[in-house]
C-alpha cells in the first residue's frame, strides 16, 4: 500500500516562536522521502515526527536564507552518523554554492559519501535521480536566487474492466489494445483504446517558498493535488510583503486558484502573528481560492489527495 503524505516539521519564517519551529517539510512518496528546506532544529522535529535519517532519499533547498537551510549540517551529519547507505541527492541553487559548502562541512565529523550535490542553474531544471516521478525546479522572485519545486508522476492509462467485458475483449487482446491504441475485432470493426480506458493523471506536489507573486509560482502549482506555499503576511501587510518579496495569505490563495490546485497548505508565518490571528490567514486565502485550505502546524500530517480521474467505469487492476 503506497503512502503519500506531507509531514510538516516547522512553520515559522525568519524567527522561530514558542509554537512554531523554523521551516522543515518532509514528503513521504511511497518509498521516497524528500526533505524540503531544513531550517534550524529540523533534526529535533524529525524525532517528534518519527522520521529517521534512513527515510531521507532527497533534500530540496529553495534558497540559502537561514530559516530554510540552517538545519542542513545536522541532517547531513545525522545521515553520516546513522550509516545511511543509499544515495541522498541534495538540490539547491548553484548561485549559493559557497553557502552549500559552508553548511555541508560546517563542523568536524566522520563524513559520508552518500550525499550527492545537485546545484541548479537556469530557468527550468529537471532534476535527475528518480524514475517514478519527475522533479522540476523553476526560479522564483525573491531577494536572493530561489527555486520552487514540483514533483509529478506520469499520467497512466487504466483499462475499464466492465466495458471490456461487455465487448468481449479479454486476455492478450487487452494488452494489444493498450499497447497499440486500437485493435480490429473478429467482425472487422476498429476498437479504440479511448473508448475502453480512463486516463488517471499522475499526482502532483508543489513547493513554493519565499517569493513575490510571479508566473513561475503558478506554473509550479499548475493542477497540483497538494501545494505548500508561503503566506508570510496577512493582507494588511501587503506593502511589507512586496518590499521583502514574500506573499500574503490572499496572494497565496490567488496563486492556488489560478493554478487549479486541489489542497492548499499555508505556512512560513511571520513571528508577528499569534494564535488569535490564524483564522484570518484561512479567510484571506479563501477569498480567492475555493478549494480545501490547511493552516500548517508543526508536526502536522497532510495527505496527498487521491488521484484525479477522467472518464468513467470500473478500472481494471486499479
UniProtKB/Swiss-Prot annotation:
Binding positions (Zn(2+) 1): 63, 65, 142, 210
Pfam families attached to this UniProt entry: Lactamase_B (PF00753), Lactamase_B_2 (PF12706)
Binding site for Zn(2+) 2: 67-68, 210, 268
The UniProt record lists the keyword ATP-binding: no
Endpoints of the signal sequence: none
Active site, UniProt feature: 67
Claim: Metal-binding is one of the keywords in the record: yes
Cofactor(s) this protein requires: Zn(2+)
Cofactor binding note from Swiss-Prot or TrEMBL: Binds 2 Zn(2+) ions.
Catalysed reactions, semicolon-separated: Endonucleolytic cleavage of RNA, removing extra 3' nucleotides from tRNA precursor, generating 3' termini of tRNAs. A 3'-hydroxy group is left at the tRNA terminus and a 5'-phosphoryl group is left at the trailer molecule
EC number(s) from the headed UniProt entry: 3.1.26.11
Keywords tagged on the record: Endonuclease, Hydrolase, Metal-binding, Nuclease, tRNA processing, Zinc
Alphabetized InterPro entries for the sequence: Metallo-B-lactamas, RibonucZ/Hydroxyglut_hydro, RNase_Z/BN
A GO molecular-function descriptor: zinc ion binding
Domain of life: Bacteria
Class in the EC hierarchy, top level: hydrolase
Assembly: Homodimer.
Similarity field: Belongs to the RNase Z family.
PANTHER family found in the cross-reference section: ZINC PHOSPHODIESTERASE ELAC PROTEIN 1
Function: Zinc phosphodiesterase, which displays some tRNA 3'-processing endonuclease activity. Probably involved in tRNA maturation, by removing a 3'-trailer from precursor tRNA.
Protein name (record): Ribonuclease Z
Native source species: Thermobifida fusca (strain YX)
Upper lineage: Bacteria, Bacillati, Actinomycetota, Actinomycetes, Streptosporangiales
Amino acid at each position: 500500500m503506497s503512502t503519500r503524505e506531507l509531514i510538516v516539521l516547522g512553520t515559522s519564517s525568519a524567527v522561530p516562536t514558542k509554537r512554531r519551529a523554523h521551516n522543515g517539510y518532509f514528503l513521504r512518496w511511497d518509498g521516497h522521502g524528500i526533505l524540503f528546506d531544513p531550517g534550524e532544529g529540523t533534526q529535533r522535529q524529525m524525532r517528534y515526527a518519527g522520521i529517521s535519517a534512513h527515510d531521507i532519499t532527497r533534500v530540496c533547498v529553495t534558497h540559502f536564507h537561514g530559516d530554510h537551510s540552517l538545519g542542513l549540517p545536522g541532517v547531513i551529519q545525522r545521515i553520516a552518523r546513522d550509516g545511511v547507505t543509499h544515495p541522498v541527492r541534495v538540490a539547491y541553487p548553484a548561485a549559493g554554492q559557497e553557502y552549500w559548502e559552508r553548511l555541508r562541512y560546517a563542523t568536524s565529523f566522520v563524513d559520508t559519501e552518500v550525499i550527492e550535490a545537485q546545484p541548479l542553474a537556469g530557468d527550468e531544471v529537471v532534476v535527475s535521480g528518480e524514475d517514478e516521478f519527475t522533479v522540476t525546479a523553476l526560479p522564483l522572485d525573491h531577494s536572493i536566487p530561489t527555486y520552487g519545486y514540483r514533483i509529478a508522476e506520469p499520467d497512466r492509462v487504466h483499462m475499464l474492466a466492465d466495458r471490456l467485458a461487455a465487448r468481449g475483449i479479454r486476455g492478450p487482446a487487452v494488452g494489444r489494445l493498450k499497447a497499440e491504441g486500437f485493435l480490429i475485432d473478429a467482425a472487422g470493426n476498429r476498437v479504440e483504446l479511448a473508448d475502453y480506458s480512463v486516463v488517471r493523471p499522475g499526482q502532483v506536489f508543489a513547493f513554493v517558498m519565499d517569493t513575490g507573486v510571479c508566473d513561475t509560482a503558478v506554473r509550479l502549482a499548475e493542477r497540483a493535488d497538494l501545494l505548500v506555499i508561503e503566506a508570510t503576511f496577512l493582507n494588511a501587510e501587503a506593502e511589507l510583503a512586496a518590499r521583502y518579496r514574500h506573499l500574503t495569505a490572499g496572494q497565496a490563495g490567488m496563486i492556488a486558484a489560478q493554478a487549479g490546485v486541489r489542497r492548499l497548505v499555508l505556512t512560513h508565518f511571520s513571528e508577528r502573528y499569534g494564535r488569535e490571528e490564524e483564522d484570518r490567514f484561512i479567510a484571506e486565502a479563501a477569498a480567492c481560492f475555493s478549494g480545501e485550505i490547511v493552516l500548517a502546524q508543526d508536526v502536522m500530517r497532510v495527505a496527498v489527495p487521491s488521484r484525479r480521474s477522467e472518464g468513467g467505469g470500473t478500472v481494471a487492476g486499479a
